[in-house]
From Swiss-Prot:
Membrane topology: Peripheral membrane protein
HAMAP family xrefs: SecA (MF_01382)
PANTHER family, alphabetized: CHLOROPLAST PROTEIN-TRANSPORTING ATPASE (PTHR30612:SF0), SECA INNER MEMBRANE COMPONENT OF SEC PROTEIN SECRETION SYSTEM (PTHR30612)
Species, as recorded: Halalkalibacterium halodurans (strain ATCC BAA-125 / DSM 18197 / FERM 7344 / JCM 9153 / C-125)
Biological role stated in the UniProt entry: Part of the Sec protein translocase complex. Interacts with the SecYEG preprotein conducting channel. Has a central role in coupling the hydrolysis of ATP to the transfer of proteins into and across the cell membrane, serving as an ATP-driven molecular motor driving the stepwise translocation of polypeptide chains across the membrane.
Gene Ontology terms: cellular component: cell envelope Sec protein transport complex; cytosol; plasma membrane
Family assignment from sequence similarity: Belongs to the SecA family.
Enzymatic reactions: ATP + H2O + cellular proteinSide 1 = ADP + phosphate + cellular proteinSide 2
Bias kind Basic and acidic residues: ranges: 801-819
Pfam families: P-loop_SecA, SEC-C, SecA_DEAD, SecA_PP_bind, SecA_SW
E.C. designation(s): 7.4.2.8
Protein name: Protein translocase subunit SecA
Chain spans, region Disordered: 517-536, 789-838
Amino acid sequence: MLGLLKKVVGDPSQRQLKKNQKIADQVEALSDEMKSLSDDGLRQKTEEFKKRYKNGESLDDLLPEAYAVVREAATRVLNMTPYPVQILGAIALHQGNIAEMKTGEGKTLVGTMPVYLNALAGKGVHVVTVNDYLARRDSEQMGAMFEFLGLTVGLNVPGLSKEEKKEAYQADITYGTNNEFGFDYLRDNMVLYKEQMVQRSLNFALVDEVDSILIDEARTPLIISGSVERSTKLYSQANSFVRVLKNEEDYTLDEKTKSVQLTEEGVNKAERAFNIDNLFDQRHVQLLHHINQAMKAHVVMHRDADYVVENGEIVIVDQFTGRLMKGRRYSDGLHQAIEAKEGLQIQRESMTLASITFQNYFRMYQKLAGMTGTAKTEEEEFRNIYGMDVMVIPTNKPVIRDDRPDLIFKTMDAKFKAVVNEIEELYKKGQPVLVGTVSVETSELVSTLLKKRRIPHHVLNAKNHEKEAEIIENAGHRGAVTIATNMAGRGTDIKLGEGVRELGGLHVLGTERHESRRIDNQLRGRSGRQGDPGSSQFYLSMEDELMRRFGSDNMRAMMDKLGMEEDQPIESKLVSRAVETAQKRVEGNNFDARKQILQYDDVMREQREIIYKQRMEVLESDNLREIVEKMILSVIERNVQLHTPESEVPEDWDYGAIVNFMKANLLNEDDLTEKDIWGKDPEEIVEIIYDKVIERYNKKEEEFTPEHMREFEKVIMLRTVDRKWMNHIDQMDQLRQGIHLRAYGQNDPLREYRFEGFEMFEAMVASIEEEVAMYVMKAQVQQNLQREKVAEGQAVQPKPTDGDSKAKRQPVRKKETVGRNEPCPCGSGKKYKNCCGQ
């Protein structure tokens, strides 16, 4: 249908290409003018462009001249002059599109033009590559040209200090990997001081190998995780303390809200038991939290009603169905508190402190562009999800590679025997061969078979990027045999050695069709670069996964009918077309899966953006008092509303519960009595309580000075938001894991996830307000306030995917360690080495 439509109305990307051709002609027309300039004259053009941009000229206006300047600078510094087709590619990139350019057509050089142009705006440009080696290589090679033109270049790789990272991001152009850019965004939203942030706002990103990052890796979440509860001791201690408390005397239970609160006597007992002066002090946040959870475990949660003990583990009981919910855990430390209550082993939990998928990270840039050799097959996905069109840029010289039809064998053994025979024949002839495999196992199998025949070869499975580039560079030399998984060696060209052209160039031999046509096209594209000779062919068997899944029975029956031998292949265009149809079907399924995941991720994205925006406001604000007062008012209104329902007569309202709550959270023991609020309507009750709380707030501020109070509010706000947000991420993860089961009850899982996720978010916001209000009113203000991280994040760099499509994508995790002399993340106030680090 799409093909027919294009025939009638024409391909829009081709129409755009024609428009861009006119701009490219303007760039070329300026060539002589730029050649006549001295090096200094060329460099001064950068300052001239910056001034013109500030005076109102758009980047589009500057494009022809700017590209002509880069073209001339590339000739002088890199000894490379971009071809007319490369200028076309560069124009498509500036327009926020994807330039599909065949291997060897100089994508890296093409990228320099839009990068230079967009850097003139002074808002920063990120050049994103798939690995550190390519980022380093490109920043050095292309960086020399940018520096010649007076722009600064930064390199963002793992292991840099905050200062080094900040410097890299302050540069006009920053090179780095997708993982590192994503992790820095997450870490910036966990800082305690605005000065600790390293990234600027996300302006323009140019993504190299865009299909790999935005499609293959799209579902991979970047996760910063940390062990929040480093010690399980506090759970046991809180449990022992709570066991001896008496109802009404030491704590009160609100039946409606199922919340438990310590009375004044209970607080005194806790301070004596733990030998501390003030339970509400900032240093004892963790202790108070553990006591509250232990009380909830003992008073609110009942064995065999809310949970059961099975095989030494706490299993939650679903309150609606009565079914056991294995694998689910209560959040916020309640699960560990119940484990302590029941005398079971207390599990340490690693929590997600922050996470984001590449899809959502890259969609935050003002403008996004990408380059790859293969994107047209995924055009619909790029357009729907990222709003980017794919422009197929013509090659500088026609491709003369001979793409032969697939060879199909009955069995895998017969296929591999034929593969090795072919390699041996080509090796004897001296023609270089690149053997493409779908998985590491296959590459090792082919390697073993070649060793038996004593054929020297190199195996590449993306374990060493530096060595990988060297092997790939030599893969076009006479007699070279290279086995590579599909992803290995992307971004490095295979140049033909001496005398290889006469032998037919590089031969690419695929041992299996990938479920994505794009990956097969990438493998083919390794040969026949820039008009070089070359050939490619895929060897398949009826036992390959793709063939097994899609209609190989008919073909096998046909082979049997023809009485074909095991090692006798079918070579047929018809078969190749059938395989391609199967691939299209798989690609469609994968696209649907990614789209669905994105819909779920969007729920979390909206929530994350709200929290991060508010967190930023807290960091930037000098006075949070107004926000805290609003939070206090919300807390009072909610509690009063709960205990003064319209459905009851005022005589039945629970005034006692209101007074107990206010004493426990906002006021002193003598500040409020039931008599003060008896007979008043809810609005009056709220007003009376609010006035009393603000009076206490003012006294506190006089006592500790406004300056200390402002920092104190900030410390409490950041700590509370971070801890509650972490728990919320955890709860949302748990909700998502079980949500698909709702489909059995004729409910739409996505709608349910949105609805429940929103309810959970609202509950989290209410919980943040309650905790901030309580600590501001109850905690002592310390003179030497320190903002402390709620938990130490941890990061693990992802392992290369090796092109193994069968390997399940693992989340990318980042871990960060605690210094021995730093404050312990558990919140005890001691140094790490004297506390949890013993």
